[in-house]
Amino acid sequence: MPNYKSCIVLLTVHFFILVNVYSQSKPLKVYEKDGITLKSYNFDGLQPFLNQKNDTLYVINFWATWCVPCVKELPHFEKMNKKYNKEKFKMILVSLDFPKMIESRVIPFIKNKNLQAEVVVLNDPDANTWIEKVANEWSGAIPATIIYKNEKRKFYEQSFTEEELETEIKSFIN
């Protein structure tokens, strides 16, 4: 007589593995230029990055190359990415640059600034719909950042100094 409990456990594990694989959405487009690979998503494709349920700390920063405060704070995000990437830590820099600027401006920017954190582009013109899905309190201004781990989640519509960013990250680690 087969061990049904073992079969059920095995099927459940396989189910969750498949769900995890398929929850990572496919990009709308993948750009490759000058050794940089950049994925572009609509909001439905980006949303899984905003709602992972595992023991990893996620830092998601919304920025653009034309946003002076965004560009000013990016080195702080890069420094924190380098400092914490050995732990269960994932940083994603979500560019809100226009699609026509990806190859001419975003990719050269990534290369010139030597950005090591994962950069993706959000290409979804229906901002009035997706902004409130990111955070109810978000006006749409950038820079904006979400930091979350499991059920703890905070949204910031502000620029960060290095010290402020590290303090917030540490509040999720400790």
Placement of each model-derived feature along the sequence:
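N-proximal helix/coil linker or "cap" segments that precede and/or mark the start of modular domains
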Residues: 21-40, 108
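Bacterial Sec-dependent N-terminal signal peptides
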Residues: 1-28, 174
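A short beta-strand-turn-helix
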Residues: 37-58
